């Protein structure tokens, strides 16, 4: 029956700017780029070697409902060495919200893409 999730959408104000951030800053690979009948491109990026892709879709980015306290990330990216990943991304201009936060199960480090979509890195123990 159901086998796997293959796409999720991240709403962006400028597809080219978002593509540059996800490929040149985060190191994702460009996936599919096809025009659609109604105008915007169907544009995806993915972590190297994975089937799961993010659709960079025109829309109202980073506009979730206001919440109290910590806001969950739009998505989480797994890493084996969060300190090295934070250092590398910081050198490419990424600004982390609160640095690396330790939990009993591992570590998280949150940041935002150029459109304000919340992302986080995760390292499990």
Where are these regions (language model features)?
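Vicinal oxygen chelate
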Residues: 1-7, 29-80, 84-114, 123-125
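Short Gly/charged-rich anion-binding patches and loops
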Residues: 17-18, 84
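Conserved active-site tyrosine of GNAT-family acetyltransferases
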Residues: 18-23, 89, 116
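Conserved beta-strand-loop-alpha-helix junction that forms the acyl-donor binding cleft
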Residues: 12-14, 37-38
